[in-house]
Amino acid sequence: MLELWKYTFLGIVQGLTEFLPVSSSGHLTVISKLMNLNLETETLKAFFALLHLATFFAVLFFTYKDVWKIISGVFKKNEQRTAWKMIALLLFATLPAVVVGLGFESQIDKAFSGIVFPALMLLVTAFFLILADRFNGNKKILDLTIYTALMIGLFQAVAILPGISRSGMTVFAALLFGLSREDSVRFSFLMSLPVTFGAGIIELSKVSTETPYAISGFIAAFFAGIVGLWLLKKFVLHGKLRGFAFYCIIVSLIVLSISGGI
């Protein structure tokens, strides 16, 4: 029963922190270490990937209108140009994360091995969240160019590191390039679909019989993810990301103190 609650708790943590700008990877790495989970490295990675797949479905549920508009637009003559531009923007925004994830897999794995590095990266996340509240553009997603989509994608690629928030970095980058707060959130959500789906599918085959409670984590991550998406949208629209920055700083200092990093 204790193991069940551990997996469920990790699912809730993943669902909330995947979208709240406080770094899901950092939280999962630190918390799993503190909980002393009896999982082999590959199995732990696979479980985390399964949680990413759960958050993919949460985003899909939350953005189904946008996703359906893009898909259906491909088959409607008067909407094809808009649909294909959206697809191109999302592809180029995803490309950097794919290159970094596949090209530096071993180095990234090492970053997940301890808790000091994620704690330090939480301070980086805090810095960008404080800056994000300073921007308030008026551009729409379709005003982006392939170049700006690629640049926003670079920020997403950096967030592969534990402790760097994907949602925080992508929302910051979108705001930096002039998107409105609402469209910054929308683009961040849509960008997460290929990344979370890819991470889940690639590692899903590694889930073993040693994780019998993985489904509880999956369900918890899905519902917590929906809550996290709703909360992020509200906080971004009201320009209140700074509160999450202070949270990241506090958590970072606590973890560094526990680990002896400071």
UniProtKB/Swiss-Prot annotation:
Against InterPro entries, the record matches this protein to: UppP
Task: List the catalytic activities from the record.
Answer: di-trans,octa-cis-undecaprenyl diphosphate + H2O = di-trans,octa-cis-undecaprenyl phosphate + phosphate + H(+)
Which biological process annotations from GO are given for this protein? cell wall organization; peptidoglycan biosynthetic process; regulation of cell shape; response to antibiotic
Q: What is its EC number?
A: 3.6.1.27
Q: Name one GO cellular component term.
A: plasma membrane
Cell compartment(s), UniProt:
Cell inner membrane
The lineage's top-level taxon is Bacteria
Q: Which UniProt keywords apply?
A: Antibiotic resistance, Cell inner membrane, Cell membrane, Cell shape, Cell wall biogenesis/degradation, Hydrolase, Membrane, Peptidoglycan synthesis, Transmembrane, Transmembrane helix
The GO terms this record gives for MF are:
undecaprenyl-diphosphatase activity
Record has Hydrolase as a keyword: yes
The way this protein sits in the membrane is described as:
Multi-pass membrane protein
Task: Name the family.
Answer: Belongs to the UppP family.
Main function: Catalyzes the dephosphorylation of undecaprenyl diphosphate (UPP). Confers resistance to bacitracin.
What else the UniProt entry mentions is:
Bacitracin is thought to be involved in the inhibition of peptidoglycan synthesis by sequestering undecaprenyl diphosphate, thereby reducing the pool of lipid carrier available.
Name assigned to this protein: Undecaprenyl-diphosphatase
The gene is uppP
